[in-house]
Curated annotation (Swiss-Prot):
The gene is wbbL2. CDD domains: GT_2_like_c. This is Uncharacterized protein MT1576. It comes from the Bacteria.
Amino acid sequence: MYAPLVSLMITVPVFGQHEYTHALVADLEREGADYLIVDNRGDYPRIGTERVSTPGENLGWAGGSELGFRLAFAEGYSHAMTLNNDTRVSKGFVAALLDSRLPADAGMVGPMFDVGFPFAVADEKPDAESYVPRARYRKVPAVEGTALVMSRDCWDAVGGMDLSTFGRYGWGLDLDLALRARKSGYGLYTTEMAYINHFGRKTANTHFGGHRYHWGASAAMIRGLRRTHGWPAAMGILREMGMAHHRKWHKSFPLTCPASC
């Protein structure tokens, strides 16, 4: 995954909820990150020199993320990331996601969470700025779309995002990418060097309504995974999301420096 020259562009799809985005922008500026805000509602108020793309329609999280990935790779970045606007990130975030000590087959990487997929949830849940990184990583079945990095090679291998199947809500898109990346021979990892606070579907709940969003998104996810990968694969990865299943995904390994680093 990590060539001698690595670079990352982070895309933040937004639809209102500007106070969350502004707080995240402060974190990204602190980290020296290259980032793009995809302004789905067309009313994002800059607080500095943010790069903003206004598509003129609501692409949603999925469409906004896909736009960011395509732009990043067209502009020559080796890696691209989608990051929810209702998050805060730990110190050293960008460097942690591009860590040369991660396994060489890494196609998708994500941080630890305070709330998220169970195998990526930290035991302690501090404010992101107070997180103490650990030089360890976990081999995981999927990387949550809230904060998901892909290499350009992995993106090309899986053929990008399937917006026709998963585009409306975005649920299941990360699982679909995970299944396709694994089938293509890429490893999926969570690094304990990076961590986020996630405040939880603020934009989606505002736009769709909490219960309506949850049930509609869940049903669309299951239908999409079944149609694309079949019942065994769909049910298999959904089971792997459960806290009680496959405790092996919680096991961590030390980050060690390869001969080339």
